[in-house]
């Protein structure tokens, strides 16, 4: 039969590869970065949640911004440029995990991987809307799966909508899993005046003054 499959409302997840060496940044994280426990899952995060303001991360920040422009303007075709807001390091020792969560007050989120290998658990994306009925599946794909395990390599950045639920299973390796996460937002406005959806941040700040 003649047929056409249409993928409605696809969720864009982009992976980009950092080509430069990042040993200096990783060495800084391992030796100088202060960590605090992040919840009850035996994982840690950096005390500093604005790490990309530090000069040592300037090359990585430029790579993140370039990747964001590809994601936002070439894939999503949006006009308002995204800027990085908070940024922090995740430190997952052996036997730790990362609970399911989203990133509120952010549009697109990113995770850069400093130290991962094939023995470590991949990031897991979970379906936002549940399937109404459980049916027996003989082969899983993007239409019938409730979660998606995405293997990542060191030096890769992954970008995804901040509303997308994600988690990390227990680290069963004997090494620390180290990554850097960041959130984004616009600096000027959201929406469109013509469509009556405009939120002009600069104008709001002027009124406050």
Predicted segments, located by residue:
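Short clusters of hydrophobic/aromatic residues that line enzyme substrate/ligand-binding pockets
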Residues: 50, 123, 168
């Amino acid at each position: 039969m003649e047929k056409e499959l249409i993928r409605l409302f696809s969720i864009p997840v982009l992976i980009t590869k950092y080509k430069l060496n990042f040993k200096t940044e990783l060495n800084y994280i391992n030796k100088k970065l202060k960590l605090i426990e992040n919840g009850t899952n035996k994982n840690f995060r950096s005390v500093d949640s604005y790490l990309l303001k530090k000069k040592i991360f300037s090359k990585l920040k430029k790579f993140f911004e370039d990747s964001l422009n590809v994601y936002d303007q070439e894939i999503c075709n949006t006009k308002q440029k995204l800027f990085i807001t908070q940024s922090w390091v995740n430190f997952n020792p052996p036997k730790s995990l990362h609970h399911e969560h989203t990133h509120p007050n952010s549009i697109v989120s990113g995770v850069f991987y400093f130290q991962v290998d094939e023995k470590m658990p991949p990031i897991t994306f979970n379906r936002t809307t549940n399937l109404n009925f459980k049916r027996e599946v003989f082969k899983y794909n993007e239409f019938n799966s409730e979660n998606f395990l995405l293997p990542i390599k060191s030096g890769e950045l992954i970008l995804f909508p901040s509303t997308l639920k994600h988690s990390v299973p227990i680290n069963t390796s004997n090494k620390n899993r180290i990554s850097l996460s960041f959130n984004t937002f616009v600096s000027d406005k959201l929406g469109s005046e013509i469509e009556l959806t405009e939120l002009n941040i600069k104008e709001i700040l002027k009124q406050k003054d």
